Each structure stands twice: as structure tokens, then as C-alpha cells.
Amino acid sequence: MLLLQFSNMVEPTGPAIVEDERTKALNSYRRKLAECRDIEQKLKDLRKKESEMTKQFDKSENDIKSLQSVGQIVGEVLKQLSEEKFIVKATNGPRYVVGCRRSINKEELKQGTRVSLDMTTLTIMRQLPREVDPLVYKMSHEDPGNISYSDVGGLAEQIRELREVVELPLINPELFKRVGITPPKGCLLFGPPGTGKTLLARAVASQLDCNFLKVVSSAIVDKYIGESARMIREMFNYARDHQPCIVFMDEIDAIGGRRFSEGTSADREIQRTLMELLNQLDGFDSLGKVKVIMATNRPDTLDPALLRPGRLDRKIEIGLPNEQSRLEILKIHSNKITKHGEIDFEAVVKLSDGFSAADLRNVCTEAGMFAIRAEREFVIDEDFMKAVRKVGDAKRLETKLDYKPV
């Protein structure tokens, strides 16, 4: 009994002590490793904060310098005399022979380039972008929207022809070089109102990663002589500077009408605008990445000089849709409508003879209005039948237009 108690009082030796020390060391290592990771994360956050504060400090310093610095004069380069000297015309009138900063690329300082001049030495400090008219700047910020070709129903042949004229030369110009032909400069979309001319142009611009200028032709006409022609020049200069670019001119009959000898001063101003447009169309580079799309519902009033090949190489007629096309368009417009039960679209299409795409969209809107009138949150087949009859009765008051090939 005494021997047993003595053995219990003896401390463990050998492997047990080694295992205990190993466990303690391992736990200590894990704690140190966790502390190291925390310190690394804190260091990373501090460095990120330091970088942000450095950027903010630099920005504040630049703002203070810009507030303390003297303004500069805007001028225009007239001629390069030597490698370092240029003749510059200031905005207030006089001309100066000035030097240039070393950091500026002198090859880009061509005639007509806008530059900023130092107030005291008149040295060229930096190159400025081309002056853009506010109206042209507004045109360039026109968003074509996220429209795909599947949103344009019943125009498969017209889409193919338009993509050959606009999309193919921008994506694969080498194909035209190998064949040995000059790519078309632009095309004319003509047809009755509401057939999808503007929608088709927006779909092309949305699918291409390029700049888009939407021009309403009636907005170009100005009461002051020469202003309309200047707007055309600035518009095409902006398009050339921001290639690839698509210029879409809607309602081109506002400035592209047939010229005649008699008329008022306003008519002569519109004719001068048309002549400037003809000049800009002829001035394009053969493989330039600027394409023109024009749209009108009055092709018979356009000037023959505008329609000749070399300016508008392809004329695409967008007529009223046939029965199959009307079915496709109706399904596209009714896709987002909350429907209940089965809708007989074929019966609706048979009652919509002579309808345009805009009329079919109006049918869907009227069907929704009938559902709202009946205090329902969904549209049934009867609503579509009522809507197509209502739109058909309204179309009888419209005058039918005859579109002959251009």
C-alpha cells in the first residue's frame, strides 16, 4: 500500500513530458501565427488608407495650385515656322510667334489646332480638344438603348442589308480590300410611318461598340445665314474625330428636299445646308469608319443629288409587314404583358390587315387599357380582339400613302 502511494506521488517522466511541451509549443505557435495574420491585415488596411489619403492630398494640392495659378489664353495654331516656333492666333484677335513646351508632341500641332497660351510668355502650354457645338455635344450623348435585332420583328431581309452597309465595313474592312470594292458610305431607310426605321437604326448602333450621333434634321435649320451649314460641318468633324461613328439623320426630308430656283430666303438657307451635306458626304475617306443612315417617309421629295450612288449607296424600303411579320411583331410587343389563358394571336393578326408595327404596339396598349377598365391585372384574349377592332376603326380615317421605289 505504501509503495502504491509513493508511485502516485512521482511526476510523469519521459514521453509524457515531451508530448506536453510539444502541445504547449504548438498552441503558442498558433497564437503567434494568428497575431501575425491580424497584424498583416492591419498593415494592409493602413497601407490602403495611406494610398487613399495620398491621392486625396495630391488632388487637394492640385486644386490649390489651380486656384492660385493665372488663367491661360485660348488660341489657334496657324503655321509652324520651325521645330520650336509657331504662329498662333489668339481669341482676342492678334497673332504671335510663340514657343512650345517640350512635353507637347509638336507633330500634333497642325493648322487649326486649339491650344492654350501662357498669360505672360504666350508659350503653348497644352493642346486643347476641338471645339464642339453644344447641340452636337447633345447629339453625341443620345443613348441608342439596349436594343437587339430580336426586338425588331418582321424585318430580317432589311436587317441583313443594313448590316452589310454599316456593320460589315466597320468590323471587317479587310474583306472589301480583298474583293477590291469600296464599302458603301451610307444608306436610306424609307417607308410609311411607324414601320420601325428609327428602331432599326438604334438596333444597329446598340449592337456595335461605336459612337452614335442621332440628328433630327429639322433641329439643324437656323434662322441665321450660314449657321445650319456650320452645324453640318461640326457634326461630321466630330464624327471623324470619334471614329468609328454612326450618324443617324432622322426626317432627312426637312433639309434634303428637291432644290428649285424660286423661293424665299429660308428656302435658300435650307438649300445651302443641303449643299454642305452633299459636300461632307463626298469628302469621306473610302474606308473611313463613319457611316451615315438617313430615314424618311417622303422619299419622293428628296433631291436626286442626295440619292445618287456614292453618297447613299443603298436604299432600303421598310414597308408594311405581312401576316407572318405582324405575328412576330405582335408577340414581341405582348411579351411583357401579363396574360391569362391562351391568346389567339393568329386571329388578331387576321384582323390587322394594313397595320404597321406602331399600330400593333398600339393594339397591345389598348388591350391593357381594356383590362384596366375591367379592373383586372391581366389581359385576356377578348381584350386583344376588342383592341384590334378599335385600332382598325381609327385607321380608316388615315390617308393611304403610295411608296414607289427610289
UniProtKB/Swiss-Prot annotation:
InterPro entries: 26S_Proteasome_ATPase (IPR050221), AAA+_ATPase (IPR003593), AAA_lid_3 (IPR041569), ATPase_AAA_core (IPR003959), ATPase_AAA_CS (IPR003960), NA-bd_OB-fold (IPR012340), P-loop_NTPase (IPR027417), Prot_ATP_ID_OB_2nd (IPR032501). GO terms for biological process: ERAD pathway; positive regulation of RNA polymerase II transcription preinitiation complex assembly; proteasome-mediated ubiquitin-dependent protein catabolic process; regulation of protein stability. Its main location: cytoplasm. The gene is rpt-4. Belongs to the AAA ATPase family. PROSITE patterns: AAA. It is found in: Cytoplasm; Nucleus. The 26S proteasome is involved in the ATP-dependent degradation of ubiquitinated proteins. The regulatory (or ATPase) complex confers ATP dependency and substrate specificity to the 26S complex. This is Probable 26S proteasome regulatory subunit 10B.
